[in-house]
Amino acid sequence: MYEKTRICECCGKELVYGSYTAWCWAEKNKTICKSCASKKRAKRLNDLTVLLEETPETYYWMGFLLADGHFDEKRIIVGLAEHDRDHLEKFAKYIDFEGTISLVKRGPYCSVRLSAMDTEVVKKLREKFDIKSNKTYNPPKTLNWIPEKLFLCFIAGLIDGDGNIMNFHKRKDVFIRIKQHKTWLPILEELGSYFGETGRVKINKQGYAELYITGYPKIRELKRKLLEYNIPLMPRKWGKIDLNLKTKYEKKAETYAEIEKLLRLGVKQTKIAKTVGVCESTVSKVKKLFIR
């Protein structure tokens, strides 16, 4: 039996021909294997390769997808509440999605859904970020390989996907909370370590792992940095963080610093109290604390 082979220029697969004529025709026309030909004919409805880039927005979306998306072997599926449709549309634009964003109704609730397929890219993403199909119970082993700048964007994506930014009771300052299955505890500890003492991790009474980020100056600085990276933060969450707001502790520290400055310049305590807008006992207290 006649048998001659050649290599597919696209994937490197060996192609076998049963006649010399067939081999000559294929060689002359530089034909490729059926699988590669099928992929070329298929219309691309998205470009997931952008999610392999080392950019702030890519890492933001990967954090978001790790929290709120689903990865199977071939595709990425994202479903959000209908009121967050604009955010899903931003993701669709980022991956050049040309398919349909579906509206899903379940009783009184409506959600929007997007499914983007690319077997090769999804495989690479799952390997790069250690993502399993049942990621709710099997999180990545570690995220500490991500550079700091991109790590912050990744955290922001997680917050927008599975976190909350909430006000303290009867206060204008906020705290951030991320709640996950208890198997996520090591990952939340990695995230919390970036924020030092203001990032606390615990297992709550229901058995979930929770990360709390407190300390308004740290949260305010986080938002400032993220705005520099021009990533698509959710306004309904990050809008709660007022960059001009100062806590009572910050205001107190500034007042004490101003009093100390005037004391060292030799200004009388009565005049300092009037200038700064405090009582003389406060000036005396600062003098005892800082002036030796």
Model-derived features: where do they sit?
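Internal intein/HINT superfamily modules and their associated LAGLIDADG
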Residues: Y2-R292
